[in-house]
Structure formats: structure tokens, C-alpha cells
């Protein structure tokens, strides 16, 4: 069983209420980003001069050199590609070489 309560409110009345809200709301000029009482101002976007100063401090990125090591894998260390993958690749290469040799003959 549903209960229906009709709301006796015309669209004109709702429109009048919205107009009243819009008329009483502060304008964008009043909302503007003015300095606060403590003297600090709001800043949304970074100051371009800060960007220039930051770039001058960073002439270049630090370089990190990583050299591969050929040694025993420590316990728990993962290597890529895994040795099983390398063995499978070698087998596939050998199969391809064999088929190419048969085609050449």
C-alpha cells in the first residue's frame, strides 16, 4: 500500500524562492580572494617567480647508474628474466634454427 501526499507548491513559488536565494547570496566580487585579517593572502596558483627560482636551483637531475652483476643470486632475491624463461627461449631459438636449416637444404 502506498501513501501519496500531494505537495501544493507551484513551480512559480519554487522559482520565487530560488530568485530570493540568488538575490540574497553574496556576489562574486564580495567573495573575492582578499587578504585575511592576519595579513596573509590566498594564493591558488603558484607564483611564476618561484618556478624560475626552483629551476635555477636544479640545473640537472641526479644520475643514477646501475650496473648488472653476474654472480650468485642471494637467497630470496628475484631475478628477471627467470632462468626457466631463458632456457625456454634457447630451446625455441634452437628449434627455429633447425627449421631454417631444413628449408635451406
Curated annotation (Swiss-Prot):
One of its GO terms (biological process) is regulation of MAPK cascade. Pfam families: Lbh. The keyword Phosphoprotein applies. Coiled coil: none annotated. The modification Phosphoserine is found at residue 63. GO terms for cellular component: cytoplasm; nucleus; protein-containing complex. Keywords: Cytoplasm, Developmental protein, Nucleus, Phosphoprotein, Transcription, Transcription regulation. Residues 86-98 have a biased composition (Acidic residues). Residues 18-103 form the LBH domain. InterPro entries: LBH, LBH_dom, LBH_dom_prot. Expressed at highest levels in heart, and at lower levels in brain, spleen, lung, liver and kidney. The keyword Lipid metabolism does not apply. Residues 68-105 are annotated as: Disordered. Mice overexpressing Lbh in heart exhibit severe cardiac abnormalities and dysfunction. Modulates the activity of key transcription factors involved in cardiogenesis. PANTHER family: PROTEIN LBH, PROTEIN LBH-RELATED. Belongs to the LBH family. This is Protein LBH.
Amino acid at each position: 500500500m502506498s501513501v501519496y501526499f500531494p505537495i501544493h507548491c507551484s513551480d512559480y513559488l519554487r522559482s520565487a524562492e530560488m530568485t530570493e536565494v540568488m538575490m540574497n547570496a553574496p556576489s562574486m566580487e564580495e567573495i573575492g580572494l582578499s587578504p585575511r585579517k592576519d595579513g596573509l593572502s590566498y594564493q591558488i596558483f603558484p607564483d611564476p617567480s618561484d618556478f624560475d627560482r626552483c629551476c635555477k636551483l636544479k640545473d640537472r637531475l641526479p644520475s643514477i647508474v646501475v650496473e648488472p652483476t653476474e654472480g650468485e643470486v642471494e637467497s630470496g632475491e628475484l631475478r628477471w628474466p627467470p632462468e626457466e624463461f631463458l632456457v625456454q627461449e634457447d630451446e625455441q631459438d634452437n628449434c627455429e634454427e633447425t627449421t631454417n636449416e631444413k628449408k635451406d637444404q
